[in-house]
A protein has these predicted regions:
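Asparagine-centered strand-capping/turn motif at beta-strand->loop junctions
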Residues: 38-42
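Short, surface-exposed loop/turn segments at beta-strand-coil junctions that are enriched for proline
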Residues: 94-101
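Short, surface-exposed ligand- or partner-binding patches at beta-edge/loop junctions that are enriched
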Residues: 101-111
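Short, hydrophobic/aromatic beta-strand segments
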Residues: 44-57, 104
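Low-complexity, acidic Ser/Thr/Pro/Gly-rich terminal tails and inter-domain linkers that flank the onset
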Residues: 2-28
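Short beta-strand and strand-turn-strand segments in soluble, beta-rich domains
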Residues: 54-79
């Protein structure tokens, strides 16, 4: 069990995602971006693609205050072969948020049309986002 939980990575479905610019505080209605560093911790190359419907991309679920349904976001539309052990920085655009409060964003990689990496044991990055009334 320990090997499966800590070392086994099916195919290329294991990555470490770290925030480059946290904590996040934004004003209502303001556009924002979140930069993350993605490190390939699998033993195979992760193939990012510029096409939206295929390949690997950065994906996120943005959960608003109050438990409403999350908004699904995508980024990382680049042609990039991320070798095992290599890292890259990607920027995730955040939509303007109208409601003040504490949001939560869960960031993962997604193999479009196949699986989110989390489904196969990779740990997503979860961060709070504080949204305050614009001055």
């Amino acid at each position: 069990r320990h090997w499966v939980a800590t070392e086994y990575a099916p195919y290329f479905y294991r990555a470490q995602i770290e925030s480059v610019d946290a904590p996040i505080r934004i004003a209502t209605g303001a556009a924002a971006e979140l930069r993350v560093r993605v490190t390939n911790t699998s033993r195979q190359t992760i193939a990012f693609q510029s096409e939206r419907q295929r390949g690997v991309h950065l994906g996120a679920h943005l959960r608003p205050p109050g438990g409403a349904d999350p908004t699904e976001l995508r980024a990382g539309f680049v042609d990039l072969e991320l070798e095992p052990g290599a890292a890259t920085e990607l920027t995730l655009p955040l939509p303007p948020l109208a409601e003040p409060g504490r949001y939560e964003i869960e960031i993962d990689l997604v193999d479009e049309g196949v699986k989110w990496f989390q489904a196969l044991g990779s740990q997503p990055l979860t961060l709070p986002i504080e949204v305050a009334e614009a001055p």
